């Protein structure tokens, strides 16, 4: 496992859980991704317009993208995050993610108290 500021590369022999940090969103820390060992290696990359120092055109609290390519996951999270300026834009972000499929496996978008999912995303119970 390698982590660098919201970007994670996973390659483990056991299942892992990844918590999505979404800043001040009421959903922050409540969304846990289940990453099965048979789905790795996997890049899990998060972009935010409200958390951290990186510039974003959007205001999503978290856009988390899963892909076999960590570089693609990072780029897709940034692209989708730039589109989400309010909760009303979550659907637009999901449609953009679906255009990138199957290059990415899935996406989680959190904006305020709203969330959207697309693709192969398993939430831990």
Predicted feature descriptions by range:
Residues 1-89:
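Conserved mixed alpha/beta catalytic, RNA-binding, or beta-rich assembly cores of soluble enzyme
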Residues 2, 66-113, 117, 121, ...:
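Alpha/propeptide regions of enzymes that mature by internal proteolysis
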